[in-house]
């Protein structure tokens, strides 16, 4: 299947520390058992909150800053756009732009995914997974070039 191919393609990829932002207020993320957490793993991402108990835990700003993710990823509420885009000026990232010491902010590794692909569990989740892998591949390429 497509997910098996993505996993195989990223099996030896250098890991990327990721914060997946589900919601801003309250600040929510996913753990490793939630499908998006599993997709991060497929793509060689290391979810900075993988081990929290709730599937969709609430976290503090301070906890995210302390985790210092290399990439911050969220999904658009409106689908139908590009599968993913680098979007450091999106309102979803306003909180993080005030944290310039974070790697993700310093490097502008702030990404928005098409919510229709990643947030709605169905056949298109495979396209969402491909988008996540593309995002993390971009971070890896830029990180290696530094």
Map each language-model feature to its residues.
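Binding-cleft/active-site segments that stabilize strongly anionic ligands or cofactors
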Residues: 2-126, 134-145
């Amino acid at each position: 299947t497509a997910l098996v191919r993505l996993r195989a393609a990223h099996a030896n990829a250098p890991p990327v520390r990721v914060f997946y932002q589900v919601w801003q207020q309250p600040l929510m993320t996913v753990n490793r058992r939630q499908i998006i957490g599993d997709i991060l793993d497929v793509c060689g991402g290391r979810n900075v909150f993988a081990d929290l108990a709730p599937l969709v835990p609430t976290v503090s700003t301070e906890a995210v800053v302390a985790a210092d993710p290399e990439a911050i990823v969220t999904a658009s509420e409106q689908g139908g756009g590009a599968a993913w885009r680098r979007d450091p000026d999106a309102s979803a990232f306003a909180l993080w732009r005030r944290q310039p010491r974070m790697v993700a902010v310093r490097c502008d590794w702030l990404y928005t995914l098409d919510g229709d692909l990643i947030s709605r569990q169905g056949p298109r989740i495979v396209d969402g997974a491909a988008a996540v892998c593309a995002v993390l591949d971009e971070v890896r390429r830029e990180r290696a070039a530094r």
